[in-house]
Amino acid sequence: VQLQAALAQAPQGKPVTIRGKISAVEKQALKVTTSAGEVSVKLPDDVRIGGVETAQFSDIAAGKYVGTTAVKQADGSLKALEVHIFPESSRGTGEGHRPWDLQPGSTMTNANVEKVEQVAVEKIQGQLLTLKYKDGEQKIFIPPGTPIVRNVPGDRTLLKPGTGVYVAAVRGEDGTVTAIRITAGIGGIMPPM
């Protein structure tokens, strides 16, 4: 019953993602400057807000729950564009492997880290993560310099002009964009997902 009530209250429309920097903050809205221009984003009272802070590869270990955006290489293997480490309380969030919209052909995998190995791919030293989820597994190469962040709790105090954000939202039939979840960069970073 609670799930049905929550779904009934969720904003209706086409899912959209917005990546950019906050240019203005109002009580119930944000203006976000993206590569395509400025977007006005409605902030409902129940919008979920979290942050990301810089992390290191050494923070990733077997048993952690992570998400990674990757692209397929010519040989069919996956190369990470970014990795985000979830807190234990978020284990299971978006679990699985699916298409993603960071760039053409990109994918998102949210899964448990099964194994971490040191490898060389085309003479580039890096790490190979074996990620396991309910219906399968993926092996993803993490080259040096790949952005790695840690998801942390957040609230509206993170939403300030100049802050980099990733916004999961819906666009209504009237064109209004309503945020469902906002991830804000902490310490000047841009959420890499």
Residue spans for each PLM region:
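Short, flexible, surface-exposed loop segments at domain boundaries
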Residues: 1-193
